[in-house]
Structures are given as structure tokens and as C-alpha cells.
Amino acid sequence: MEEIVNKVANSALEVFDLEDYYPKGIRSQIDISLWLLEGFLLKEKDFRAHLNNHDWSQYQDQYVAINCSTDAIVPAWASILVSIQLAPFAKKIVNGTIEDLDAALYEKILSEVDYSIYKNKSVILKGCSKKPVPMRAYVLAANYLQDFARSIMYGEACSAVPLFKKK
């Protein structure tokens, strides 16, 4: 009987797993609509009162996204004012969703990776993840890898989709 050989383990493929770069920490979202009259109308005096009475310390060392879940037309200064209140406590603040927050975190992290270790190698951008890796992170990682890798595939070694190959 022939010995079973794990061809994937013996291949020269390098796996780039975005989960390895997922920043640990609590992510929170602040919905400005909760401080609007009926979720739609910003009354400045009431809005500022809500901000003054809010316990900002609960966001200590957290990643925070500020958004408005309704279709309210909110002046730009409202989100800015919330971010100013958050600044002494939060690790990172973005205007948008949790996905926007994760994308911003990945932008910083991926810009600091040394991609030269992938020079002239076949790289698989690992596609299955248990953590919420935003699509923007995959696009950004592929763009960084393209400058170094001989080829880039997406997925798993057993079922990868070719994306790029140097000519």
C-alpha cells in the first residue's frame, strides 16, 4: 500500500492569513440617533446635554465606531463632537460602522507588514476566517502582496482561485 503524501504541506505555497493580524480588543458602536428627537431631529441643546451626561469611561481602551442608524440628516459637527468626548478613552475612533472600524484598523496594520518575505513566492490569501475580516482588508493585502509575490491565490490550498501571476 502506498504511503499517503500531504502535497499541500510539502508545497512551496505561503499562506497570508488576515486573521493573524486581527487586532484584539473590544469594538463598540455609538448610534447618534439615540440622542436625536424621535431618532431624526438634532436639537443642539438636548444633544449636548446627552453628551455631557453620557459615561464615556465605558469606552476605555475600546475601538469605537460612530454612526447614525436612521436616515436623519446629521450635521458633521455632531460626529466630531462625539469623537472629541471619546478621545480621552477610546483606542481608535471612526465615523461609520464596525466594518468601517475594522477596515481602518487593518489599513494601519497592513501598511506596517514586511511583505518582502513573500518575494517571488506563491501566496494564498486565506479566505475562510472565523473573525470578521472586512473585504477591504483582502483587497488591501492583495495590493501589497502584488508588489512582491510571484502569484497570488485566494481561498485554501486545496481549492484556491488564481488572482495574479507575474509575467
Predicted regions and their residues:
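Short glycine-rich or small-residue beta-strand-to-loop segments that form or flank ligand, phosphate
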Residues: Y63-S69, V94-G96, S122-C128
